[in-house]
A protein has these predicted regions:
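EF-hand Ca2+-binding helix-loop-helix modules
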Residues: 2-52, 57-60, 73-82, 87-144, ...
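Surface-exposed polar/charged interaction patches
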Residues: 50, 66, 70, 121, ...
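Amphipathic regulatory helices of Ca2+-sensor modules
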Residues: 55-69, 91-105, 148-163, 187-200
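Short, tandemly repeated low-complexity microdomains enriched for cysteine and small residues
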Residues: 109-115, 149, 170-171, 204-208
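Short amphipathic alpha-helical linker/capping segments at the junctions of internal repeats
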Residues: 115-121, 172-179, 208-219
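Eukaryote-specific, cytoplasm-facing alpha-helical/coiled-coil scaffolding segments in long proteins
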Residues: 121-125, 157-162, 180-184, 199-200, ...
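Conserved binding-pocket/active-site segment within a compact domain
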Residues: 134-182
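C-terminal interaction modules of eukaryotic adaptor/scaffold proteins
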Residues: 184-187, 191-230
Length: 230
């Protein structure tokens, strides 16, 4: 046999061995992944409804009890954000897996301990707008719903923004409750109120320009606030 033929034979013989090693590595990795999901799924199954296969409002209340947080606590909304949950009050198994894998937790105690850091993550400037917009979408409970009623808006905006901008939020909520022109709020108005809080000097409003592209709702709020301040 020539040297070239021998080298070719060696390459051919080594190919099955390499393939077998690769299969072995993939198999081991798959087992580790499956084991990780098994623990995560065990928690999910504790709270999930047996018929729907999802964690429903009753299950989330039980989860909150075990986590020792209130059902209306912002941490639960942030957890839903981490899972990228699509329907308010419900967690699918895929959403649950996504969230807990990202948090690197596989039991309730670890999940409970992760919540304070998760809150810090969501409130970082690089993440907050994404969380803020998610909060609005998450509360749109009906199919093709685009707007949120004013009462729900007031509750939500106080929850997600009130601790950062208490004066602006309190004043805006007061305005929303007494005005009669708007029964709902849309995403553009919601997004621009965050921009308002971040950019506009308050309460003097010296840099608010009605000629800029602000929603009429905010123009009306500014006009009302100036009259109230007199």
């Amino acid at each position: 046999m020539t040297r070239a033929s021998k080298r070719k034979s060696d390459v051919q013989n080594s190919a099955p061995a390499k393939s077998a090693r690769a299969d072995s590595i993939r198999s081991a990795s798959s087992k580790v992944s499956a084991k990780g999901y098994q623990r995560i799924d065990e928690i999910f199954n504790k709270y999930a409804d047996k018929t729907s296969g999802m964690i429903e409002p009753e299950g989330i209340e039980a989860l909150c009890s075990d986590l020792e947080v209130d059902y209306t606590d912002i941490k639960i909304l942030i957890l839903a954000w981490k899972m990228n949950a699509q329907k308010q009050g419900y967690f699918t198994q895929d959403e649950w897996r996504r969230g807990l894998k990202a948090l690197r937790v596989d039991n309730i105690n670890k999940l409970k301990k992760s919540l304070p850091e998760l809150k810090k993550e969501a409130l970082k400037s690089v993440n907050f707008e994404d969380f803020y917009l998610f909060a609005f979408r998450y509360c749109l409970t009906e199919e093709k719903q685009k707007c949120l009623d004013i009462e729900s808006t007031c509750i939500l905006i106080d929850l997600v923004l009130g601790f950062q901008y208490p004066v602006q939020v309190d004043s805006f909520i007061q305005f929303l409750k007494i005005q009669s022109d708007y029964k709902v709020m849309n995403m553009d108005q919601w997004k621009n109120f965050l921009r308002f809080c971040e950019e506009i000097s308050f309460p003097d409003l010296r840099n608010y320009d009605t000629c800029e592209a602000w929603p009429l709702l905010l123009d009306n709020f500014v006009e009302w606030f100036k009259k109230e301040a007199v």
